[in-house]
C-alpha cells in the first residue's frame, strides 16, 4: 500500500474528533459556550496539567485503573470459565444457563442498593459491580463461540486421533476466539460505564470521585476532564483488544483480510 494512503487511513478516524474539538474551542472563544456550561478545551487541558502537577490526577487515575482491571479479571475469569463449561457440557448448560439468563435480565446497576447492604460502601462493592458488569458479555460470547465451532472440524480432529485436551486447544478454543474477543470488547465498554457509577458510591478516590467532588464546587472543567479521561481509557482498552485480535486471529481469513487492507 502507498505510504501516503496508509498514513491517511490511520489519520482518518481522528478527523471528526479533531474537527469537533476545534469547533468547541472556537465556540468557547467567541462566547457561544459559557464556561459554566462547557469550558473550552484549553481550560480543560490547563486543569489537567494542574492536576497532574499536584499529583491528584495520576493518583486517581491509578486507583480507577486498578479497580477496572481487578473487576475485569474477576468477572472475566468467571464468565470465561462458565462459558467454557456450559459450552462443552450439555449437562452444565441445562443446569446453570437458565439461572444465569434470569440473573442477566436484571440490570446490574439496579442492584446497587442491595450491593451496599451486602458489602457496605467499601472497595468490595465497587469490585462486585464491575465484575458483574463484565461477566455476562464474556460468558455469553464464550458460550456462543464454543457452541458454534464447526462440527466438521471437531469430527476431523477426532479422526486424526486428537485427545480431548488437544482437540480443545487446537480446534475448539481457536474456533471460539473471534466470539470471545467480541465479548471482551463489549465487556470493556460495560466495565468503564459501571466504574463511573460505582465510583460515585461514597468513594474517596478515583476519577469518578474526582468528578463528584468537582460537581459540589461547580468545577465544570474537572467534570469534563473526568469524562474525557473515561473516554480515552475506553478507547485505549478497545485498541488493545483489537491488537490482540489481530495477533491471535491472524490465521482467520476475515482478520487477515482486514490486516491486509490496512
Task: Describe the predicted segments one by one.
Residues 128, 132, 164-197, 221, ...:
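Transmembrane alpha-helices
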Residues 90, 147, 178, 182, ...:
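C-terminal transmembrane helix and the adjacent membrane-cytosol boundary/short C-terminal tail
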Residues 1-28:
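N-terminal signal-anchor/first transmembrane alpha helix
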Residues 98, 141, 145-183, 211:
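Short cytoplasmic-facing helical segments at TM-TM junctions of multi-pass membrane proteins
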Residues 2-4, 30-73:
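Periplasmic/extracellular loop-to-transmembrane helix junction in inner-membrane transport proteins
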Residues 101-137, 144-145:
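Generic hydrophobic transmembrane alpha-helix motif, especially the helices
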Residues 70-100:
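Transmembrane-helix boundary motif in ABC transporter permease subunits
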Residues 116-117, 146, 193-230, 249-259:
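Glycine-rich helix-loop "coupling/hinge" segments at transmembrane-helix boundaries
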Amino acid at each position: 500500500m502507498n505510504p501516503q494512503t496508509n498514513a491517511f487511513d490511520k489519520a482518518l478516524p481522528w478527523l471528526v474528533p479533531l474537527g469537533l474539538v476545534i469547533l468547541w474551542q472556537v465556540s468557547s472563544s467567541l462566547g457561544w459556550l459559557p464556561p459554566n456550561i462547557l469550558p473550552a478545551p484549553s481550560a480543560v487541558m490547563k486543569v489537567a496539567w494542574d492536576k497532574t502537577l499536584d499529583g491528584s490526577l495520576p493518583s486517581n487515575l491509578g486507583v480507577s485503573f486498578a479497580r477496572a482491571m481487578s473487576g475485569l479479571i474477576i468477572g472475566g475469569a468467571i464468565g470465561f470459565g462458565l462459558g467454557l463449561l456450559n459450552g462443552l457440557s450439555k449437562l452444565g448448560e441445562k443446569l446453570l444457563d437458565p439461572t444465569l439468563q434470569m440473573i442477566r435480565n436484571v440490570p446490574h446497576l439496579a442492584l446497587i442498593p442491595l450491593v451496599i447492604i451486602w458489602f457496605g460502601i467499601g472497595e468490595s462493592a465497587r469490585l462486585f459491580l464491575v465484575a458483574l458488569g463484565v461477566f455476562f458479555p464474556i460468558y455469553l460470547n464464550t458460550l456462543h463461540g464454543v457452541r458454534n465451532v464447526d462440527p466438521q472440524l471437531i469430527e476431523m480432529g477426532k479422526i486424526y486421533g486428537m485427545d480431548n485436551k488437544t482437540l480443545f486447544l487446537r480446534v475448539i478454543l481457536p474456533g471460539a476466539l473471534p466470539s470471545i474477543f467480541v465479548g471482551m470488547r463489549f465487556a470493556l465498554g460495560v466495565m468503564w460505564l459501571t466504574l463511573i457509577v460505582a465510583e460515585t458510591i461514597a468513594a474517596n478516590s478515583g476519577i469518578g470521585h474526582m468528578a463528584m467532588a468537582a460537581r459540589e464546587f461547580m468545577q465544570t472543567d474537572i467534570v469534563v476532564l473526568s469524562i474525557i479521561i473515561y473516554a480515552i481509557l475506553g478507547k485505549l482498552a478497545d485498541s488493545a483488544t483489537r491488537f490482540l485480535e489481530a495477533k491471535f486471529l491472524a490465521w482467520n481469513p476475515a482478520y487477515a483480510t482486514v490486516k491486509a487492507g490496512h
